[in-house]
Amino acid sequence: MKSTLALRPVFHRLEPRIRAHVLLCWLALLLLSLALRPLLPVDETRYLAVAWEMWWRGDFLLPWLNGEPYSHKPPLLFWLIHALWALFGVSELAARLLPVVFSLLSLWGAARLAQRLWPQQAAGIGVLVPWLLLGGVFWNNFFSLLQFDLLLVLAALLAWHGLLTARHKPLGGWPLVALGIGFGILAKGPVILVPVLPALLLAPWWAGSAPAPGWPRWYLGGLLALVGGAAMAL
């Protein structure tokens, strides 16, 4: 504990520099990926083909592939691709900007979540978490891929932040949980419940103390958030 307290001023002084290094490292990895790696079959090429056929048909509700409805994935990723095409024109590069945004937001969201979970070590952990992700094999494998996985990560992070907020501010926290679940369902289906539901149900073991309204209202709020998220995705 003493060593942590002693390091706290050091982290405060180095935090801006470390954050800049994280951004530079992320940018270098990103530019290398965009410059040296084409869209990978089968997944990336298929998803871009679905987005293009929806755009060509003018049908932005139902995904299409090769003249048939494509029901394998929800439409959120395709909608976001269309939004970028509407802004920057139809191109492969515009579509590949999406994982750029997803990866940067996931770095920030994970660091902020760690700071909220361990506030006594916020200065240090806020700059270490992005480095842990940047050095991880799985994050580096997905951070530039035009797929649904990082979008699902962002939805889970939003729901987790909502759970932390709901401990003390239910009216502010549960809508965030519902949004996270809804976006997760639109991103990759009910698999969003795999990271979110255990955190919700096991809150007495990680929360440290009972939420302000008590545990019965906690679980009632969680149920309403689940219903709201599911309704949002319908």
Give names to the regions the model predicted.
Residues 2-234:
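Membrane-integral, polyisoprenol-dependent glycosyltransferases
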